[in-house]
Amino acid sequence: MKKIIIVLLCVFSILIGHIAYNISGGVSGLREDIGLEIKARSNPKLRTILNNKNQYPDAMIQSLYRNEELIDFVYNYPSKKGHVYTDTIGPVTKGRYPLLLQYDQRWGYGKYGYNVIGMNGCGPTSTAMIIAGLTGRNNITPFDVASYANVSL
């Protein structure tokens, strides 16, 4: 009887662990959740984001867990989504490839597919970098490339 109880407790423990693991997105997901919650105590922007998760796409919150550099971008999303704030990428030298970030606030809130460039615009951002380096043109932004892709779909 004692062995049966021990086996049942082990099975129950494994089941509870499996459920908790899946709900949290894995061990690292659980650690990330807890880490951000702790950081939110001293970061008002992060606190606002976590208190208003319903205003953000799930993928955006998950990206924030993996990359805290996104705090400002995510924080501004509700008021800036759909807006693009420039028609150039800045100074460019032909033969040199500029570093562009898809979550740059100048174009990152522009629509791309079912989300915004800042979340899934690595292709348009990379393409804009290549065009700038090959041609020296600074007037092809990640949003321009994404717009072309959206029309082509």
What kind of region is each of these model predictions?
Residues 16-152:
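Active-site-adjacent structural segments surrounding the nucleophilic cysteine of cysteine proteases
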Residues 1-12:
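N-terminal Sec-pathway targeting helices
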